């Protein structure tokens, strides 16, 4: 039944039944191992949660973390973990249903609720994917222009706007990213090696971001009492704009397009009822942990380098590219901006 319902998904035709059964046997044996051994075994098999983590670590979360750290210091450290915890709970429930039934969620929504609900869900996914892509391209263009300035190419027009080189760099990086995304999307799932390379590429990029800001945090020091209050104090500053920053961070943590992608990525990996424990570990280690680490380190780094406790205002005009300033004291102006 499950195999019939997942027929036609890009990776389904490439399942190796014997390999899948070996994986199930290995997962069952992992359940009786010590915690660290079990965690290592699950970590090697993660995947769908990693896609969600990479998908949500975009311009929205970056901007919210930069503004939170630069405007309020450690105070709003609690927001991102709470936001992602809510998302993980939703994905865990969604994954449990999908792995139990092995059924595609779109027809299930149409049957159990109404076809119009399923259609609106799919439509919302498409609209959200388009809308949320605009800030990603804006962030990439801003970073590309910053690197061009570093290389001596003027991109900002003193009279306002950008120079011809600035527009060329902006549209060039946009076209490059679009081409890479199209190539990756059409080829993802074409063979097992490509999938593993793609997932390890995501791990490497996320790991680089974590390492970069971890170095800044270590070098600039941590106020442990403020850190504790930031994570567990659940304070909301009375400053104008604080509530907007909190709501923006929560809204950027998980999108409706992720709720559509996640169940299909589970089915396309060949996961079923025997993979429920792996799916929970995947959400915890590949989605929750990287997201919280990255956003928390960005907030702490901005709090240590940019935050001015005497300002008492929300820095709405600060941009994610400005997070590079947090790396300057440790890595220098040039390397900090490149990283």
PLM ranges: what are they?
Residues 2-63, 207, 245, 271-277, ...:
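Membrane-interface "cap" regions at the ends of multi-pass membrane proteins
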Residues 24-31, 65-69, 92-117, 142-156, ...:
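Flexible loop linkers connecting adjacent transmembrane helices
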Residues 35-39, 73, 100-130, 147-150, ...:
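Transmembrane-helix boundary/entry motifs in multi-pass membrane transporters
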Residues 45-86, 90-93, 102-103, 138, ...:
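Transmembrane helix-boundary motif of multi-pass solute transporters/channels
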Residues 52, 79-110, 121-135, 184:
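Juxtamembrane transmembrane-helix boundary signature
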Residues 80-90, 94, 215, 251-254, ...:
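Selective recognition of specific alpha-helical transmembrane segments in multi-pass small-molecule
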Residues 122, 149-189, 204-212:
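Transmembrane alpha-helical segments of multi-pass small-molecule transport proteins
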Residues 181-185, 205-235, 243-248, 252-263, ...:
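Hydrophobic alpha-helical segments and their helix-loop junctions in multi-pass secondary transporters
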């Amino acid at each position: 039944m499950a195999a019939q319902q997942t027929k036609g998904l890009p990776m389904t035709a490439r399942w190796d039944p014997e390999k899948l059964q070996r994986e199930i046997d290995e997962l069952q044996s992992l359940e009786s191992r010590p915690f660290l051994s079990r965690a290592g075994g699950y970590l090697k098999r993660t995947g769908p949660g990693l896609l969600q983590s990479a998908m949500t670590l975009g311009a929205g979360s970056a901007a919210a973390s930069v503004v939170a750290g630069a405007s309020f210091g450690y105070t709003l450290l609690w927001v991102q973990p709470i936001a992602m915890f809510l998302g993980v709970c939703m994905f865990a429930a969604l994954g449990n249903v999908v792995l139990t039934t092995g059924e595609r969620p779109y027809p299930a929504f149409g049957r159990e609720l109404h076809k119009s609900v399923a259609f609106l869900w799919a439509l919302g996914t498409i609209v959200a994917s388009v809308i949320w892509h605009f800030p990603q391209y804006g962030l990439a263009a801003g970073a590309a222009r910053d690197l061009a300035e570093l290389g001596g190419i003027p991109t900002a027009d003193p009279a306002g706007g950008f120079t011809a080189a600035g527009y060329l760099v902006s549209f060039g990086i946009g076209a490059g990213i679009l081409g890479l995304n199209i190539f990756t999307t059409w080829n993802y799932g074409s063979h097992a090696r490509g999938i593993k390379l793609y997932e390890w590429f995501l791990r490497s990029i996320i790991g680089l971001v974590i390492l970069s800001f971890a170095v800044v945090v270590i070098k600039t020091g941590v106020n442990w009492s403020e850190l504790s209050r930031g994570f567990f104090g659940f304070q909301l500053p009375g400053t104008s704009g604080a509530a907007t920053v909190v709501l923006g961070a929560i809204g950027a943590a998980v999108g409706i397009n992720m709720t559509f992608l996640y169940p299909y990525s589970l089915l396309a990996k060949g996961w079923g009822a025997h993979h429920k424990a792996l799916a929970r570990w995947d959400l915890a280690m590949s989605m929750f942990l990287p997201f919280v680490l990255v956003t928390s380190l960005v907030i702490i780094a901005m709090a240590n380098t940019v935050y001015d406790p005497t300002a008492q205002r929300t820095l709405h005009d600060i941009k994610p590219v400005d997070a590079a300033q947090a790396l300057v004291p440790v890595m220098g102006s040039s390397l900090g901006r490149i990283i």
